[in-house]
Amino acid sequence: MPSVDDSIQFVRGIGPKKAKLLEKLHIRTLRDALETYPRDYEDRTHITPIAEIDMEDKYAVRAVVGTEPKVNRIRKGLTLVKCTIYDETGTLNVTYFNNPYAAAQLRVGQEYVFYGKVQGYGRGRTMFSPQSEKVAPDADHPGRIVPVYPLTAGLTQRDLERVTAAALDTLTGEWPDPLPELLRAKYRLPDAVDALSAIHRPKTKDDMAQARRRMVFEELFLLCCGLQQLKERRKADSGIVFTSNGLDSFFEALPFTPTGAQRRAIMEIAADCASGRPMNRLVQGDVGSGKTVVAAGLCALAAQNGWQAAFMAPTEILAAQHAETLAPMLDKLGISCTLLTGSMTAAQKRAALAAIETGAAQVVVGTHALIQQGVQFHRLGAVIADEQHRFGVAQRAALSAKGGSPHVLVMSATPIPRTLALIMYGDLDVSVLDEIPPGRSPVETYAVGENMRKRITAFIDKQVGLGGQAYVVCPLIEDSENAETKLKSAEQHAKDLQKLLPHRRVAVLHGRMKNAEKDQIMRDFAAQKYDILVATTVIEVGVDVPNANLMVVEDADRFGLSQLHQLRGRVGRGTRQSYCVFFGADKGQVARERLRILCKTGDGFEVARADLAQRGPGDFFGQRQHGLPALHVADLAADLALMQNAREEAEALLAADPTLAGYPILLDRVQRMFAEQNDEAFN
């Protein structure tokens, strides 16, 4: 009797060669095959008579092969197989590209169900490269819902179906269900065996929907259990205790009145740091909400209690900017601020490292250089990571390891609806900065088409003439070779703008430049040595240039809404009225509607909600902390209610049984899900 832990290479029709290819999809055993869910489904249950095909679309057709399939070698690298098929209502051409085996698989006079895209009209109607299944003589309705699996070069859907069919044959009572029976009953979820069968071999759309609902709940429940265990495990560690006696002097030293949200976040941090457990908190806020002030509050707390704080930024130029912002705030309190970056001279590094090791450097700001082996902290008590999606769990852990169990504060400028944040960052507590400090005027935002090109170029010239500076952002570095989607690159835009505005100073910045070169260009732009900076999205998280008051984004339909909102946040940081112009309003109704959202609101949380709803979570949460388990089934936009249920149930279960000792199957699945974490909480 085959077992779910058997190797897939012994499945008939697979063998060692295809087994190697399947490994690329992380499929080594039959169990892996069962846990590799279809990425899509093709509904072939609706059979369309040939005569009723009236538009270019995918169809399932039950028809007989009418002419002998002929192999035509058009040229090297291109083979066509052509035949005609017919049913009671009409005939249809069939063409396969580069699949000479199709000629051997189809027999004249044999009936098949063909599924594929039909193009053309009248006698020219053709179904291209369809899937086909032979109709058994006694079959009255052979159409079915067919799973579509992820593939890699050298594998076909039939290979995945073979492996999955063999895996499904092992599904018996031996398949353990990680979901407690009470939960399955409460949410009316099918058991694991029925759900897996319906995921891979759905009989109806309802079967498929119920199975998916079960798998989504399971995935989110396992994730929430693991994150909750991780959080509780960290809380069990003894942490450094900071008293908050000096907070009043910190607030008094600020050159402005903090917002209510800033004050609330700092008080939440102070409470965490006084609890005797290591803090692990995320502060998220919109562009310009004042996260650096919150970080300064933690730095002050650490220093006032005799400990050091380390502040990591994703780029050297941002690290320098943070140091410049923090130094005057902390200097009033007698707290020193030291910068450490990779590009410093050897003498500068030696001086900084000595100050860090002796404790003379109370607050240290830097990049990944802070986690290198040569950096020895005297008494590291707090770690701050800016733009956490650019610093993974591993880097945070490496810095934390330098100080035992320091307090950790993570800052993100990507606003996320709070319900989602509590789940996606379930290993962290969450503070939200939902107020913008007074004095920042809204950025006037416009969505335009190519017909406005000359006017926008003139507007750039006008704003520079009035003393401002402009960003122009492009999605590509070099020109696209695809004529249909040809997008002008950053380099070409810079050349064109320089020709149109020869009296203006134009610079170009993109991701392929060396860090030192990028930093120098940004410093020169900030020092007003350039009027216009043409760039790719490397400026999305960039230096603060208060004098820049115009952002122009080319091909804005190529960016996500949240990314466009981040880009808009590069301007509006000074006293000048600022503007943002998105090109792409003439790219169709969908593009127009998306850009209209940005024109209507400057609220990053509102933009994030729209982004999730429109793009789905895949791209949006590509920014999730690296190192935590990926979601394979759940859709964060569509499954919000199930997500909330899963979180509540995980918290309730772990409150009653923190180690999951009474749920060994669930514990095993959680450990497997978090295996790559290699965290002691799961050993």
List the model feature ranges, each with a label:
Residues 235-238, 264-267, 278-596, 656-657, ...:
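Inter-lobe coupling/hinge segments of SF2-like helicase ATPases
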Residues 575, 587-683:
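C-terminal accessory region of SF2 helicases/translocases
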Residues 18, 71-253, 623, 656:
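Upstream accessory/linker segments immediately N-terminal to the RecA-like ATPase cores of bacterial MutS
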Residues 1-12, 20-23, 222-223, 233:
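Long, highly charged, low-complexity intrinsically disordered interaction regions
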Residues 36-66:
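OB-fold nucleic-acid-binding modules
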Residues 64, 117-118, 226, 556, ...:
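Short, surface-exposed secondary-structure boundary micro-motifs
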